Regions:
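Short glycine-/aliphatic-rich beta-strand segments at the starts of folded cytosolic domains
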Residues: 1-8
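Autoinhibitory propeptides
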Residues: 9-79, 87
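N-terminal domain-start motif of subtilase-like serine proteases
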Residues: 28, 41-44, 65-101, 121-132, ...
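Subtilisin-like serine protease catalytic core
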Residues: 88-119, 127-178, 202-207, 235, ...
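Extracellular S/T/G-rich loop segment that most often corresponds to the catalytic His/Ser-adjacent loop
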Residues: 103, 111, 255-338, 383
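Hydrolase catalytic cores
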Residues: 142-143, 163, 167-169, 253, ...
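Substrate-binding/access-modulating region of protease and related hydrolase catalytic domains
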Residues: 167-262, 289-290, 309-323, 370, ...
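C-terminal subdomain of the subtilisin-like protease fold in secreted/lumenal serine endopeptidases
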Residues: 196-211, 335-418
């Protein structure tokens, strides 16, 4: 059976030594995250669990989840993103943002994704980085697909760069091991970029990890994927944004790793003229009692690039596509802030959460405080962009939901302190 050996005080070399002493086989080590993966029998696993400073956890499966839709795709996703970017001169495109998409691979030859992918690596048990299952291509499109052009099918930040780290195999299944090795690779790239003196805006400097995948929340704070996500955020300054899951409206259904306090969990609202939580969007609290998700954003009936050929598009729904929408929004916020305050200005959702009640909106009948359906609410994009860049974003020519995205609230200037 496959296990993860997690450091609780031991060095990576010490863990590997203990594993070899126990007779472990198929050893594979991370570079930075102090975890080792290996094959153990029950007796070997029990012996290693007695070693001080070491945790032994069986490897678990993770899956992507998406819902096919028979409805005509909603046009406003690309339209409102274009409108929002166009209120700035020159228009925002999310340039400078690099999102590591840990998923089922990406069809980088698709017309909407050409020249977007700057790095590829395969940690799944499938033979190539190609998207055979059909999920990662859609996620990448929502982040950075297309061009900033009127009528163009495009994602939120078409100027952003994408890293394709395949951690889900061609049947739609991944594991603790594949996901953690992917996270470790992203941290290694960030550390290498830092050592080279690269600006965080360099395309080889990953800023966000997008995890549109998950497994059942087991309540285990020491779960190896949760450990890896926390390290990526705390030690390497990378926002980890994850899909809440599609198993609502039941309570306590937010997936792992979205359930972790250090991970930004994203639920989905209907892509309509009303702010309504999508029925299948997973709800909190987590098994440990955390209020989740953190935010909600569009996630239903979205038209995205297909993995099947280079000109095809497909309409799907799911929190899998809400998460990359928030990842893409990072690029617009960060770019607008850099214009106002200089290249050294940074934006992280992890730190912005303390201001979330001031830049998010909910239906009138929803709780004012963070709740287990909407979280803090829907980020009002225009509000946030206006505040970080001191540009007034008009709202008169958009629908009710667009106004919710773009309305100005009372928090002017508070995000200037988010660094």
């Amino acid at each position: 059976m496959r296990y993860a050996l997690i450091s609780k005080g031991l060095s990576l070399s010490q863990i590997e030594t203990e594993a070899r002493k126990a007779g472990a086989k198929g050893i594979k080590a991370t570079r930075l995250l102090n975890q080792i993966f290996c094959d153990l029998n029950a007796e070997q696993a029990k012996a290693l669990s007695l070693v001080s400073g070491l945790l032994v956890k069986p490897i678990k499966e993770y899956k992507t989840d998406q819902v096919e839709t028979a409805l005509p795709p909603v046009e406003t996703f690309s339209d409102v993103s274009y409108l929002l970017r166009s209120y700035f001169t020159p228009p925002l495109t999310g340039t400078g943002l690099t999102v590591a998409v840990l998923d089922s691979g990406i069809r980088k030859s698709h017309e909407a994704l050409r020249n977007k992918v700057v790095l590829e690596a395969n940690f799944s048990d499938s033979p190539s980085v190609e998207d055979i299952f059909g999920h990662g291509t859609q996620v990448a499109f929502v982040v950075a697909g297309g061009l900033h052009s009127l009528g163009e099918k495009a994602g939120v930040s078409p100027g952003a760069a994408i890293m394709n780290l395949k951690v889900i195999n061609d049947e739609g299944i991944g594991s603790d091991e594949s996901i953690i090795l992917g996270i470790d690779k992203v941290c290694d790239l960030a550390e290498a970029a830092r050592k080279k003196g690269l600006w965080p805006t360099d395309e080889m400097y990953p800023n966000v990890i997008n995890l549109s995948l998950g497994g059942e929340d087991d309540g285990d704070e020491d779960n190896p994927v949760r450990e890896a996500c926390r390290q990526a955020s705390a030690d390497y300054g990378i926002d980890v944004i994850a899909a809440a899951g599609n198993t609502g409206p039941k309570m306590t259904t937010v997936m792992l790793p979205a359930c972790d306090p250090e991970v930004i969990a994203v639920g989905a609202v209907e892509t309509t003229d009303e702010l309504v939580i999508w029925e299948k969007s997973s709800r909190g609290p987590t098994v440990q009692g955390e209020t989740k998700p953190d935010f909600v954003i569009w996630g239903t009936n979205l038209e995205m690039a297909s993995h099947k050929n280079d000109e095809e598009y497909v309409a799907k729904s799911g929190t899998s596509f809400a998460a990359p929408m928030l990842s893409g929004l990072t690029g617009l916020l960060w770019e607008s802030g850099r214009r106002a305050y200089g290249e050294g200005w940074l934006f992280r959702w992890t730190e912005a959460r303390q201001f979330a009640p001031y830049f998010s909106t909910k239906p009138q009948d929803a709780p004012v405080k963070k709740d287990n359906a909407y979280g803090y609410g829907l980020p009002a994009m225009g509000t946030m962009l206006g505040q970080v860049s001191q540009v007034s974003v008009p709202t008169g020519d958009v629908t009710e939901v667009m106004n919710m995205f773009m309305m100005m609230t009372t928090m002017f200037g508070m995000l200037q302190g988010v660094v």
